[in-house]
């Protein structure tokens, strides 16, 4: 049972992107609406480093990684050293012709004690970044929370497992709105509540590393995998609603800004046309996507979740339902790949999220059934992004959609990343198709601008448009082929790539096979 659950969970969280996506550009920047923005993204813990500098307190991820729980016992103590190199990166953003940049704020850097006194040096750091972006005409998108919580709040009341976090998160957001809102009009409250809660409170694979036997991927000392993922998401949704209400009442009129949330998505194809596999595909989206979005649009969880999870799924009071309902100005989605889904009988006895969803995942239709080894690679499927966008539009009406993360991860950190160029070309092309079909998509962000510490693999996977040499303490950047292509595309032309460089990229790709 535990082995099967581990395989299913790994299939969900450890599918790392490899392989080229055949694509021809066939479009230019000018084919997209003028108000559509193209950008790139990083996050505070994964990018900044400076973990104990200028008043920053430890986050849950500092504690987690310092316990040696990541591959190679890696940490983000320095990461890409964005705390010291942001000015250089701003220049690279200008060189890349970025139209927008999505960053997250470190709560531990802004309010080291989780509540109360604000750290002026933390404010100065983010003000300097924001000022630099605005000065160069780059639109600023801020994520308030991207998995890194002040450890003091974990110690005091178990973080997202306690309703006490609602007031602390609201107070933290209030500081950010007040200090940065005059220059920032695009806000995202929380990143990926769905996947974050599964990894943090079911498998124990993400900080704070809570789980219970027999469900954890790693050995956990505390946690309850059967209930904690649902409690954490419930509190995240209530916190989102509270912060949205604050923003709308106190700041939105003056700033004319918008606020939303980010949800992890993948397109799910039924493995067969059988009734049970078709139902499994729908159940997959109910548990993964609608778990977060349905309450924020319609005020309650999907009925299938209530039926299967039962009393382990928290319920909204009437007042809470009214608060969460309609608390989105836009939908933010992170999207990387598609999966094939088939039905798995609902287990008896104690269950966790993975058992509740009762689904098997495969990277392709020809993959063998899940066994002792989970698939670790999957080919790109740009059509899946288009289908996901259109599906969200059909489900939730004309809410604007921002694709806040999309990118290509590789264990080969070469600068000759032709596979990544092909991936980006094909996925951006799928967005254009969705737009022409009437989808209300407003922006697209490549993950990531520079190589960063990845939450699942540490430094084992590279996603950056710019390569970072993590073996060099100065963390030098080097433009990849993908950075040059993206820059050319944003200049409304296709980049001229030296044929010898393409040949080198092809040779490296063959050597990796």
Curated annotation (Swiss-Prot):
InterPro entries: Glyco_hydro_1 (IPR001360), Glyco_hydro_1_N_CS (IPR033132), Glycoside_hydrolase_SF (IPR017853)
First and last residue of the signal peptide: 1-26
Glycosites: 224, 273, 412
Chain sites annotated for binding a beta-D-glucoside: 46, 336, 405, 447, 454-455, 463
TM annotation in the entry: none
The keyword Disulfide bond appears for this protein: yes
GO molecular function: beta-D-fucosidase activity; beta-galactosidase activity; beta-glucosidase activity
Pfam families cross-referenced by the UniProt entry: Glyco_hydro_1 (PF00232)
Chemical reaction(s) catalysed: Hydrolysis of terminal, non-reducing beta-D-glucosyl residues with release of beta-D-glucose
Top-rank taxon, per record: Eukaryota
Active site: 192, 405
EC number from the UniProt entry: 3.2.1.21
Cystine crosslinks: 211-220
Keywords annotated in UniProt: Disulfide bond, Glycoprotein, Glycosidase, Hydrolase, Signal
PANTHER family for this protein: BETA-GLUCOSIDASE 2, GLYCOSYL HYDROLASE
Family according to the record: Belongs to the glycosyl hydrolase 1 family.
Protein name, UniProt field: Beta-glucosidase 5
Organism encoding this protein: Oryza sativa subsp. japonica (Rice)
């Amino acid at each position: 049972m535990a082995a099967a659950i581990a395989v299913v969970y790994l299939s969900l969280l450890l599918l790392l992107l490899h392989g080229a996506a055949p694509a021809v550009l066939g479009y230019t920047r000018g084919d997209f609406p003028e108000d559509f923005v193209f950008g790139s993204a990083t996050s505070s813990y994964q990018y900044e480093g400076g973990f104990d500098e200028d008043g920053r307190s430890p986050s849950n991820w500092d504690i987690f990684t310092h316990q040696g729980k990541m591959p190679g016992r890696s940490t983000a103590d320095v990461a890409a050293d964005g705390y010291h190199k942001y000015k250089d990166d701003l220049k690279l953003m200008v060189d890349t012709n970025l139209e927008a940049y999505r960053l997250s704020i470190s709560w531990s850097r802004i309010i080291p004690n989780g509540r109360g006194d604000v750290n002026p040096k933390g404010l100065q750091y983010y003000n300097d970044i924001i000022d630099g972006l605005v000065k160069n005409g780059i639109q600023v998108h801020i994520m308030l929370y991207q998995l890194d919580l002040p450890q003091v709040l974990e110690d005091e009341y178990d973080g997202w497992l306690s309703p006490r976090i609602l007031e602390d998160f609201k107070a933290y957001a209030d500081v950010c709105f007040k200090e940065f809102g005059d220059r920032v009009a695009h806000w995202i409250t929380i990143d990926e509540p769905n996947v974050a809660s599964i990894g943090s409170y079911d498998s124990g694979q993400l900080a704070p590393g809570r789980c219970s036997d027999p469900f954890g991927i790693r050995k956990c000392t505390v946690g309850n995998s059967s209930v904690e993922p649902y409690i954490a998401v419930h509190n995240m949704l209530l916190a989102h609603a509270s912060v949205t209400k604050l923003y709308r009442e106190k700041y939105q009129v003056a700033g004319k800004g918008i606020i939303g949330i980010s949800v992890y998505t993948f397109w799910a194809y039924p493995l067969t046309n059988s009734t049970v596999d078709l139902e499994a595909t729908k159940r997959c989206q109910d548990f993964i996507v609608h778990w977060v979005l349905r309450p924020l649009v319609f005020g309650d969880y999907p009925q299938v979740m209530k039926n299967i999870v039962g009393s382990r799924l928290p319920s909204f009071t009437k007042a809470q339902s009214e608060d969460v309902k309609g608390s989105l100005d836009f939908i933010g989605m992170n999207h990387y790949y598609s999966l094939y889904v088939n039905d798995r009988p609902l287990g008896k006895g104690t269950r966790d999220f993975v058992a509740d969803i009762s689904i098997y995942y495969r990277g392709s239709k020809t993959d063998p059934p899940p066994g002792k080894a989970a698939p670790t690679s999957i080919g790109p499927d740009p059509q899946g992004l288009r289908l996901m966008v259109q599906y969200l539009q059909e489900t939730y009406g004309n809410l604007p959609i921002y694709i806040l993360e999309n990118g290509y991860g590789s264990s080969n950190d070469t600068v000759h990343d032709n596979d990544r160029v092909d991936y980006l070309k094909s996925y951006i092309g799928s967005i254009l198709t969705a737009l022409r079909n009437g989808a209300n998509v407003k922006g697209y962000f490549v993950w990531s601008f520079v190589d960063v510490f990845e939450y699942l693999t540490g430094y084992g996977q590279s996603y950056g448009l710019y390569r970072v040499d993590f073996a060099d303490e100065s963390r030098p950047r080097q433009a990849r082929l993908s950075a040059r292509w993206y820059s050319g595309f944003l200049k409304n032309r296709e980049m001229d790539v030296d044929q010898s460089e393409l040949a080198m990229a092809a040779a490296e790709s063959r050597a990796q096979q």
